[in-house]
Amino acid sequence: FSVIFLLFYSLRFFLKQNSALISSIILSSSVFFLQISVNQYADIAVSYFILFSFILLVCSQKNKKLELDLLFLVGLSIGITGWIKNEGLIYSISLISSIIFFQLLNKSFLNKKNYFLIIGFLIAIIPTFIKNIFYTFPNIFLSLNFKEKISFFLNFDRILSVFKSMFTLFFTGNNYIIFFLLFLIYLIGFKKRVNFEILKIFCLFFLFSTSFIFLVFLQMPYDSIEGIINAIYPRWQIQ
């Protein structure tokens, strides 16, 4: 119940009250969301640190007096996301890349205030990389030389298999119905004048994170790609 309560009040930063209420009810009443809340609670934590980062971005735009402090907290929150679990690291890198890319397009990345964002991110993400270097299992892909890595990613059978599995799973089952229904509600209820830049960053984040997930799936054993995607991808979709 606390998750549902936090979800509603978090969405109110971006949506009109009715849209936030309806979307909270739809998401929180889905069987898959309830299963993740109980069995895969780390997924909920990952999702909330990402959501918290977007909320802090909105606050930093509205409160110029605390803008530097809030941007530091944005970077810290994004970096902490990577510590929770492997998916969090993907989201963490995707979101910081989205913010940097957006600011590069606006020619505002060299602004001094962005240093606070980067510093906060580095403080939180460096321990994650140290942990992964010493305490995670070796990755088969990382053990390949440069030529083997190129051949690995140019394996069109593998690329087609991953793309087909992701595309098929995305448009089957109950999850995709919930996803597109929520997306429609968000578009209708989004506070465009207030958070239009945040919407652009989120679109970049969605593109980058999906691309990184695709690259991760490319590293999976070829004979078990479909089974792995079927097991993991729905969690990322609901996140």
PLM region spans:
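Transmembrane-helix signature of polytopic, membrane-embedded enzymes
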Residues: 7-29
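Transmembrane alpha-helical segments
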Residues: 3-14, 47-61, 76, 93-101, ...
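Membrane-lumen/periplasm interface segments of specific transmembrane helices
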Residues: 101-102, 113-190, 206-214
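Membrane-interface helix-loop-helix junctions at transmembrane boundaries of multi-pass membrane enzymes
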Residues: 12-19, 63-69, 104-118, 187-207
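Short acidic/glycine- and proline-prone juxtamembrane loop motifs at membrane-interface regions
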Residues: 38-45
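Transmembrane-helix signature of polytopic, lipid-linked glycan biosynthesis machinery
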Residues: 31-38, 80-82, 128-132, 206-231
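Membrane-interface alpha helices of multi-pass inner-membrane proteins
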Residues: 23, 53, 57, 70-86, ...
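Transmembrane alpha-helix segments characteristic
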Residues: 21-28, 73, 194-224
